[in-house]
């Protein structure tokens, strides 16, 4: 029986049927050929081209199935990202839109046998937020592109703050060097003032003068004798003209020292020793304070370095109590409800078991908040320098939005953190 003419009703009907979606069981994924009925599909399976494709499949079946699975996943997520980027929608609706394309990758050629299994895979891998409801499975696409932009902005902000902190440290070190140089200059000046004017330089100068005058010593002796004679004559004349002062004959006698004078000398020496001891004590105290301040500065620098290394943009960890703040979950009654983090997926998505309903949800950390316990309760430090440590809540400052905690167990046991932000601590589930 020959083919129908091009413009006959039968030919037009055949072309219309070929454009639409046919039965999936008559589609060959390896050959990418759609058959219209069972007889046509049987004839295709007996063809040489199909037999060659089946030989290729038999050589590496796992690789072929994995390739089709990747194509199916990429195409499905592309459709979900473009058409339903920020909406919560039924999985069957998205799947019907996906298979509307005649050339789509069929699910029976992938490693997922059913749509339910595929939806569970999306939730398990963190591609979508998955909810099982009486009306079926609902999915919400997790927009990783906007998250990457936020992370990049936070990273740039953190780099700027680190650069500013480095500049402040450099200025502080420069000021310390200037103060040290000034203190060294003052100590050198004090040592120069304490030097005696009748020191070795004066002695050496007198020796030089004495050595220079040795050559003229013989010639000056005769002049000195004549000058002494004249001076003696003048002194005798003056004694006769002007009466001298009264001389006490007892002044020339040696004085007798009694015990009181010796005690005064001893007490003076003791006072000098006490003053020296006080001066040395003050110097020792100043040196100790300088060492203590240097040690404090080193500890502060180490604390800042630890803060920079342990400060991350993700904070979820298993075993903590969090509060769900997602508006999309408000319809189900999960908004502002507390749950326990059971598992963390890709660092940013948490598997939360609600405390009241015991339902398990997968929620991004941006839609979660930390929970602060009562005074005396146990918390976990989820971010910052002491990330991963358990601590005891001591007090809460509601004006500054920070808390005072004491680290328990571990390397920093007993250390008190006076002001740690609410976002860096979270209640531990008992």
From Swiss-Prot:
Gene Ontology MF terms in the entry: double-stranded DNA binding; zinc ion binding
Zinc fingers (C2H2-type) by residue: 28-50
Keyword Coiled coil: yes
Coiled-coil spans in chain: 147-183, 283-312
GO CC, alphabetical: nucleus
Organism: Oryza sativa subsp. japonica
Top-rank taxon: Eukaryota
C-terminal subdomain B: annotated segments: 376-427
UniProt family annotation: Belongs to the KIN17 family.
Chain spans, region C-terminal subdomain A: 319-370
Keyword Coiled coil: yes
Identification of the protein by name: KIN17-like protein
Motif residue range(s): Nuclear localization signal (NLS): 155-158
Disulfide bridges in this chain: none
Acidic residues compositional bias, start-end: 191-224
Sequence ranges of Basic and acidic residues compositional bias: 261-278
Subcellular location: Nucleus
Region (Winged helix-turn-helix (wHTH)): 51-160
Keywords on record: Coiled coil, Metal-binding, Nucleus, Zinc, Zinc-finger
Gene that this polypeptide is encoded by: KIN17
Main subcellular localisation: nucleus
Biological-process GO terms, alphabetical: DNA damage response; DNA replication
Lineage: Eukaryota, Viridiplantae, Streptophyta, Embryophyta, Tracheophyta
Annotated region described as Disordered, given as residue ranges: 179-230, 261-284
Pfam family, one: SH3_KIN17_C
InterPro entries: C2H2-Znf_KIN17, DNA/RNA-bd_Kin17_WH-like_dom, KIN17-like, KIN17_WH-like_sf, KN17_SH3, KOW_KIN17, Rib_uL2_dom2, Znf_C2H2_sf
